[in-house]
Amino acid sequence: MNRENQKIKYFEAFRYSRISEKIGEYKDYPTESLEKEIEALLIDAKEEQVKRKADNLAYIILFFLNTSLYTKSYKYMLIAADESLYINKPLSIRYWVPDFTNEDASLIRKELVQNKAKIPDLSEAEIEEGIRVVLKGYEGIIAILWKKAVEKVLCEDMFKNKDIEEIPSVLIGEYMGKLKKVEILTD
């Protein structure tokens, strides 16, 4: 097996073991910082909606930003939009950085450096690639936290006692890519 294939297999196995460990750790992770961002997003969206006389809020979206893995900002974009999601400017945009990603990136780096015996002579660029591969796998964890935070804000706080039709659709996915609907519990 050539070095590139060996490296890819190693990074994927490393990501799988790391994510398996972290899912249990983060599934009960507090979502207050994300909830605050969602609340601010919705408040800004309502203000913009009144200012623009725009349609009602139709979507709340969390976008995964691949560029943030390269810039090491580890940001996720939150958008509130009306029906014209990609056509017009969104009603509101905010960014959320999970407080655990910077620390995890450092731990991943340390583990990759310590495990150089498995892939000898990992360059700095290859270590950075390994960090990106592992953190890309955090999307599942972020999706769990997103669902939990959105349910709290929409169903327990801002949209409590509202008809289900009044609650905007909640989506998640790659920026300018495929989006998935998040089914939220409204009870």
What residues fall within each predicted segment?
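Short, Lys/Arg-enriched charge-dense amphipathic segments
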Residues: L42-K53, S73-N88, K116-K118, V134, ...
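Short secondary-structure junctions and interdomain/linker hinges
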Residues: A45-R52, N115-L122, E126, A149, ...
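Aromatic- and glycine-enriched beta-alpha-beta binding-site module
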Residues: K51-I108
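Short N-terminal edge-element motif at the start of the domain
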Residues: I8-L57
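Short N-terminal helix-initiation segments at or just after the protein's N-terminus
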Residues: M1-E12, L107-A117
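Acidic, proline/glycine-rich low-complexity IDRs
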Residues: M1-F11, V133-D187
